[in-house]
Swiss-Prot record:
This is Lopap. Disulfide bonds join C24-C131, C58-C187. GO terms for cellular component: cytoplasm; extracellular region. Residues 1-16 form the signal peptide.
Length: 201
């Protein structure tokens, strides 16, 4: 489901997700995060695999400001159909950092989960991060997304992203990344509809 998988992945998990021994790593979100500067369209360049994925590609998300929060519309293309979810992205109370909460409507369900932005320049790239601890098994599930304002990262942004990933190589195994297809064929769709099937627990 590509970028659409971002919204499903952080809300549900099965064996295909990246699950690692130990607790979630101690990551730092972007300080003094500017919600208004983050608005607009982002394209998913690559990410860790998502268990909820089907055969979707051409993933993107649009953030629209609304009274201090960001409305969300995230979609992907699958079998010539654009499938999308809607929701809101809000800052957590008591912090100016990019420690965010994502709420997504799926059918009659509203799913809520953390989503941190751990690096961005607002104009070219962003790195989204989510982690869930499984205390009983002493493991954690990690999701990370490399995002761009365009369907390809420019060289400067690519260098910045690669530096971040190198600095966090213990937390993020780069061999786990899968890339998004933005070819004309992958992005072609005849109709669109909202995702309504419940998922997760």
């Amino acid at each position: 489901m590509k970028f659409f998988g971002l919204f499903l992945a952080i809300l549900a998990s099965t064996a295909a997700d990246v699950v690692i021994d130990g607790a979630c790593p101690d990551m730092k979100a972007v300080s003094k995060f500017d919600m208004n500067a983050y608005q607009g369209t982002w394209y998913e360049i690559k990410k860790f695999p998502v268990a909820n994925e089907a055969n979707g590609d051409c993933g993107s998300v649009e953030y629209t400001p609304d009274n201090g929060l960001l409305k969300v519309r995230a979609g992907h293309v699958e079998d010539d159909i654009e499938k999308f979810v809607v929701g809101v992205l809000t800052k957590n109370a008591g912090t100016s950092d990019a420690e965010l909460t994502l709420s997504v409507v799926v059918g009659d369900y509203v799913r809520v989960a953390p989503l941190w932005i751990v690096s961005t320049d607002y104009d070219n790239y962003a790195i989204g991060y989510s982690c869930k601890d499984y205390k009983k098994s002493n493991q954690h599930r990690v999701n990370i997304w490399i995002l761009s304002r365009t369907k390809t990262l420019n060289e400067s942004s690519k260098s910045t992203v690669n530096k971040f990933l190198k600095e966090h190589s213990k937390e993020f195994d780069q061999s786990k990344f899968v890339e998004t297809d933005f070819s004309e064929k992958a992005c072609f769709f005849k109709k669109s509809h909202v995702y309504t099937v419940p998922f997760g627990a």
